[in-house]
UniProtKB/Swiss-Prot annotation:
One Gene Ontology CC term in the entry: cytoplasm
EC number: 2.7.11.1
The species this protein was found in: Neurospora crassa (strain ATCC 24698 / 74-OR23-1A / CBS 708.71 / DSM 1257 / FGSC 987)
Protein name: G2-specific protein kinase nim-1
Keyword set, alphabetical order: ATP-binding, Cell cycle, Cell division, Coiled coil, Kinase, Mitosis, Nucleotide-binding, Nucleus, Phosphoprotein, Serine/threonine-protein kinase, Transferase
Function: Protein kinase that plays an important role in mitotic regulation.
Coiled coil: 291-383
Sequence ranges assigned to domain Protein kinase in this UniProt record: 7-290
Length: 858
């Protein structure tokens, strides 16, 4: 890459005798330079030597008031020489003078002094080869330092071509002395003998062909300052000769009045004809005004330098600020990245640590859980090991010694408890003739509380009791629970058992999983109901709903109706079903009573004293429903006592021999008599009566009251406060079948026939009549049909034989005015009424009904 390619050509700024001056820009740093293009193809040898001397001098001169020289470029192909020098933006001093002439203005004196002082300083550097001394503190005078001695062997440079066109001005009006093409380098003691300059600025010694000395440049300096002030040269003529003559005379015109005399005097000193009288550059520098100008120039230079430095520093500061901001941004980004990296790393570490601790804690809790489960399993296994066991038939065995001693804090039965865990459900075919002699089968009876639901294994620990379907209570009552209605609000508190263990009713896991033990078929016939004081416990069944405030399956918001639990048993339960040791004892006792009933008179004392003479429960409440069975039983006991004192036992034997005794769960059957004997017994009834005894017909109806259940309306009325016994009897009498009335009345006639001779006439008191309350239309039709059937049968059988009644008389025997009510060989009779939804048929099996002919023959 050539030197010319490193610069960018901008414009042409002038031309000279040797070439063209152009303005260029350096591409490296953008610096503006001045290129002087000189073609030495047509130069003579002397001119080539002068050109060589110029760039040699410029290369050694380095001063602020001298045009700077950078380098040269020699183009051999075109024989051109390019000199790159400092660029002066304001042109030269000759253009300034032309502008003043053009504008008809005078230059300011301060400007003139500034140009003068700078030219003196530049000439001082050329004449003495050193820079002039600084003003410093010697503003008022340079002293001995004003005239320095040139260094030995130094070079003295004579410009020899000072003119306004060779004085250049910078942007700040700084003077730059240039164009040293005609300069001559000579020793300090040498003098130049040739003059090659402009004739308007040549000194008198040059005109006189004398030698050229340093004082010649001072003359040229005076001519330039005078032309700047007067806008014309000091010496001017039309011909060369006249010009030389005027120069030798040395007379000049005064300066315009705008300038000071000091300036004119200084110019006159410089234009003295005698060179020895001219001041040198050192003397000129010592002038007060020059010192001030120099000092001012120094201040300006200093301010410019300071401003430049400030700009440089500001630029540097801005660069540093930008770099600092970039560094801060980079630092923040790096820190954010490091923080994010550290955060991620610590989050990962924390997550791992948390996971480890969580896993450790989970493992610890799992171990604790397994240990706890193992401990509870062992405890349950130990408890199951000493809990109740079940045999192959599903019967519950005896509890362990620990569980047997635990007694529940409340009674779980709604009607009391029997001898065993389950009541006897056997019929007459299951009764054993042999009397059980094992005393261990009979356990102590536990006092009952009324209207409590049964819960099995109540004495077992709470941890081992689990929930069963028996403890489930539906949200809405189903029809199956109407059989156990308890409509009185006063019975609600004692109806529900406080369930402390809302779990499975079985404390231990049964050994047998036979589901047939709990699937008990429902009885289609009416179930017996007796006195509530002698009621027995219900058979535990999973289908029954436990009314308990602590039942977890009960609905809190919906309260079911109070229930009156009735005793229901099935007569078709297999023999090998759920049985207990107490059941066997009950069967043997029942058969023993039946075996002797046909041979001995019927008495109240011998009929199951263990069942009759039970102590009343201390926690039992008295029912507000009148107990008809209890009244009949007390009247029967009085009649039996009367007959045992003075009468014969034949009538009682006759009556009791015809009674078919059934255990609990079967239908009751009284003496089976034909219609004729019944009518005859009614006609021959003794009229002798006790004041406290009710009529015979009422007793029969009262005894038969336990056959059929009450209607829903009557139950509501009974729970609300009860009805009179007479109204109940009169209303219930129409609901009985004819055969049921006949059997009960026949037994009463046979027992009272022996007293007909002593009393003279039989008195049949009429039962108190009350207006019946029909329930439905079908119920009224049924009453009318039953009444018609009763009348027709009574009239058709009124002529029957009286053999049955004749057998009841005896001499010396006290007659029993009231018939003896059948004594039911049961352990407990309940007063609770059966469900009205269970219809009891009046048809009896043929095996239980004895024909009338057989009765008369016996």
């Amino acid at each position: 890459m050539s030197e010319s390619d490193k610069y960018e050509l901008l414009e042409k700024i002038g031309h000279g005798s040797f070439g063209i001056i152009r303005k260029v820009r350096r591409k490296a740093d953008g610096m503006i330079l001045c290129r002087k293009e000189i073609s030495y193809l047509k130069m003579s040898q002397k001119e080539r030597e002068q050109l060589h001397a110029e760039f040699s001098i410029l290369s050694t001169l380095r001063h602020p008031n001298i045009v700077g020289y950078y380098h040269r470029e020699h183009l051999k192909a075109t024989q051109d020489l390019h000199l790159y020098m400092e660029y002066c933006g304001n042109g030269d001093l000759g253009r300034v003078i032309r502008n003043l002439i053009k504008n008809n203005q005078y230059a300011e004196e301060s400007f003139v002094w500034s140009i003068f002082s700078q030219l003196v300083t530049a000439l001082y550097r050329c004449h003495y080869g050193v820079d002039p001394p600084e003003v410093g503190k010697t503003v008022l005078g340079l002293g001995s330092t004003a005239r320095p001695k040139p260094p030995s062997g130094g070079m003295t440079i004579l410009h020899r071509d000072l003119k306004p066109e060779n004085v250049f001005l910078g942007e700040d009006n700084s003077v730059k002395l240039g164009d040293f093409g005609l300069s001559k380098v000579m020793q300090s003691h040498d003098f130049a003998s040739t003059y090659v300059g402009t004739p308007f600025y040549m000194s008198p010694e040059i005109c006189a062909a004398e030698k050229y000395t340093l004082k010649s440049d001072i003359w040229s300096l005076g001519c330039i300052i005078y032309e700047l002030c007067a806008r014309e040269p000091p010496f001017n003529a039309k011909t060369h000769y006249q010009l030389v003559q005027k120069i030798k005379e040395g007379k000049i015109a005064p300066l315009p009045s705008v300038y000071s005399g000091e300036l004119f005097a200084t110019i006159k000193d410089c234009l003295r004809v005698n060179p020895d009288r001219r001041p040198d550059t050192a003397t000129l520098l010592n002038l007060p005004i020059v010192r001030l100008m120099r000092k001012e120039k120094e201040v300006v230079e200093f301010s410019r330098t300071l401003r430049t430095k400030e700009e440089t520093l500001n630029k540097r500061i801005r660069e540093l600020d930008s770099k600092l901001s970039a560094l801060e941004t980079e630092k923040s980004s790096i820190r954010a990245e490091i923080d994010a990296s550290l955060r991620r790393e610590w989050e990962v570490k924390a997550r791992l640590e948390i996971d480890r601790l969580v896993a450790q804690e989970i493992e610890s809790l799992q171990q604790k859980f397994e240990q706890e489960v193992q401990a509870r399993v062992e405890a349950e296994l130990q408890r199951h090991g000493r809990g109740p066991m079940f045999n192959s038939h599903g019967q519950q065995g005896s509890f362990s010694s620990t569980a047997a001693t635990l007694v529940s804090d409340y009674n779980l039965s709604s009607v009391g408890s029997g001898d065993g865990d389950f009541p006897s459900t056997t019929d007459i075919t299951d009764i054993s003739i042999a009397e059980s002699t094992d005393g261990s089968d009979i356990t102590k009876k536990i006092p009952r509380t009324p209207f409590h639901r049964a819960q099995t294994y109540s004495s077992a620990p709470a941890e081992s009791v689990l929930g069963t379907p028996m403890d489930i209570e539906m949200a809405s009552p189903s029809p199956i629970t109407i059989a156990s209605l308890s409509l009185s609000p006063r019975r609600m508190a004692l109806t529900k058992a406080p369930t402390t263990n809302p779990r499975m009713i079985f404390g231990e896991e049964p050994t047998s999983t036979d589901k047939s033990n709990w699937e008990v078929p429902r009885e289609t016939e009416m179930i017996d109901s007796g006195d509530e004081s002698e009621a027995e416990a219900l058979v535990p069944s999973p289908k029954r709903i436990t009314k308990s405030s602590k039942n977890p399956f009960s609905t809190v918001t919906t309260r079911s109706r109070p229930s009156l639990n009735s005793q229901q048993n099935s007569n078709v339960l297999p023999i090998h079903g759920l049985r207990s040791k107490q059941t066997l004892a009950t069967r043997s006792k029942t058969v023993s009573g039946v075996s002797s009933i046909g041979q001995h008179p019927l008495r109240s004392a011998p009929s199951a004293p263990s069942l009759r003479d039970r102590k009343p429960s201390p926690t039992r409440r008295l029912s507000r429903i009148p107990s008809v069975t209890g009244v009949g039983r007390r009247l029967s006991a009085n009649n039996i006592n009367n007959s045992s004192n003075g009468g014969s036992d034949a009538p009682s034997s006759t009556v009791t021999s015809n009674i078919t005794v059934r255990t609990r769960g079967l239908k009751r059957m009284s003496s089976t008599c034909d219609e004729s004997s019944f009518s005859q017994q009614q006609n021959n009834q003794p009229q002798q009566s006790l004041p406290q005894a009710p009529p015979l017909k009422k007793i029969g109806l009262m005894a038969a009251k336990n056959i059929r259940g009450s209607s829903l309306v009557e139950l509501h009325q009974a729970r609300a406060g009860g009805r009179p016994i007479s109204a109940i009897i009169s209303n219930e009498a129409k609901l009985r079948a004819f055969k049921e009335h006949a059997t009960i009345a026949a037994s009463a006639v046979d027992s009272s026939s022996s007293s007909s001779s002593s009393s003279g006439q039989s008195q049949l008191p009429t039962r108190p009549r009350s207006q019946p309350q029909p329930i439905t239309a079908n119920f009224e039709q049924q009453q009318q049909q039953q009444q018609s059937n009763t009348n027709s049968i009574s009239s058709s059988n009124s002529a029957g034989s009286g053999s049955a009644t004749g057998t009841g008389t005896g001499a010396g025997t006290k007659s029993m005015p009231w018939p003896v009510a059948p004594v039911w060989n049961r352990e407990v009779e309940t007063e609770e009424m059966p469900s009205p939804f269970i219809v009891k048929t009046s048809k009896r099996p043929a095996s239980f009904v004895r024909p009338a002919s057989n009765l008369s023959q016996s």
